[in-house]
Design a protein with these regions (language model features):
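N-terminal cap/lid segment of alpha/beta-hydrolase-fold proteins
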Residues: 1-2
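Conserved HGGG/HGGXW glycine-rich cap/lid loop of the alpha/beta-hydrolase fold
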Residues: 5-59
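Structural signature of beta-strand start/N-cap positions in the alpha/beta core
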Residues: 15, 41, 84-87, 108-111
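Short, hydrophobic alpha-helix immediately C-terminal to the catalytic nucleophile
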Residues: 30, 75, 99-103
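Active-site loop/oxyanion-hole signature of alpha/beta-hydrolase fold enzymes
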Residues: 34, 43-89
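Gly/Ala-rich beta-loop-alpha elbow adjacent to hydrolase catalytic centers
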Residues: 90-94, 98
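Flexible "cap/lid" loop of the alpha/beta hydrolase fold
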Residues: 99, 103-104, 109-139
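Conserved alpha/beta-hydrolase catalytic His-Asp/Glu region
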Residues: 123-125, 141-157
């Protein structure tokens, strides 16, 4: 099961689940926790291969790394915590997974807030995802980040 952190609000039965982007971790949401916890129970996730959910290189190649597999990782945590329905907040890759989850299990998604939403991945994006997932074990994060920024960001015209 992927790593998760809970911030409880004893006066609420509603949940907000935060899903980070590629290369990130649940720590990106630290500024949002206090305000959301005033009204909701907060669930932070570290996606497979990120943050405290990182796997060993040898094991990483044996796992299926698809959007539906990652969405099922999220569902596994919700089931484990007996969360029937949640609001979701996501950024970048997180938006893809929230959408995937909403398509697979619409009854589990109360609402979606999607920042920097990615609506579909073209072939180039899919290749970059595989390359990034493979090389993150052997290259420093900053080098990978700069490479992807160079490839993804638009050129000056």
């Amino acid at each position: 099961m992927i790593n998760y952190t809970i911030y409880e609000n004893k006066d609420s039965n509603q949940w907000v689940t935060f899903v980070h982007g590629a290369g990130g971790s649940s720590s990106i949401w630290f500024k949002q926790i206090r305000d959301f916890q005033k009204e909701y129970n907060v669930l932070l996730l570290d996606l497979r291969g990120h943050g405290a959910s990182q796997t060993k290189l040898k094991k990483a190649f044996k796992q299926k790394y698809t959007f539906s597999a990652l969405a099922n990782d999220i569902l596994e945590v919700l089931d484990h915590l007996k969360i029937e329905k949640s609001h979701f907040v996501g950024i970048s890759l997180g938006t893809i997974l929230i959408r995937q989850l909403a398509e697979m299990y619409p009854e589990r998604v109360q609402s979606m807030i999607m920042g920097g939403a990615i609506l579909k991945m073209n072939f180039r994006s899919q290749i970059l995802m595989v390359v990034g997932n493979t090389f993150k074990y052997v290259l420093p994060y900053l080098i990978l980040y700069r490479f992807f920024a160079f490839v993804i960001m638009p050129n000056k015209n």
